[in-house]
């Protein structure tokens, strides 16, 4: 009998913890970009032009010696990806950039990044993606490459620059649920597209 009396209380506590976690997640997603940590490499996860532009600027400033842009479409070129970047894409800079075309999900980003890090002897990595995506990206990359030291570099997404609305709330809630799922090891789908 006491057990059944405790159930509503436990549900209330779990709901409170869940809501507090979501509130923290929202604040964290909107956190301003901090000064970047110098690393061996930089990885930018596709999904927004601002992520690629930020990663190219970081590479140009010498924050990392190599850059992986993970999740690039099969026909996209480096020139197309960098056309709006506020830097000059010199041949020397271009030679330090790898376009990863096999990842089709965040899990795939992790696998693709791990392979690239091993091939290029990367021991520390700056992860560039949207603020709402950074925590899940860090989980998946760490799972795939636990030996690499990761540092987050969240970029403010255009979707979060506007006044909060239903779409913003839905985006953050969806990402929060997926972040929890990634911690629990759920939704472990196909990592990479098949190699040709």
In which residue ranges do the predicted regions lie?
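A transmembrane-helix-recognition feature enriched in membrane-embedded lipid enzymes
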Residues: 163-194
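Generic signature of intrinsically disordered, low-complexity segments enriched in small/polar residues
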Residues: 15, 21, 135, 179-185
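N-terminal type II signal-anchor transmembrane helix
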Residues: 2-33
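A structural signal for short, hydrophobic/glycine-enriched beta-strand patches
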Residues: 27-166, 172
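Proteins with a high burden of low-complexity, intrinsically disordered sequence enriched in S/T/G/P/A and R
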Residues: 20, 26-36, 40, 178, ...
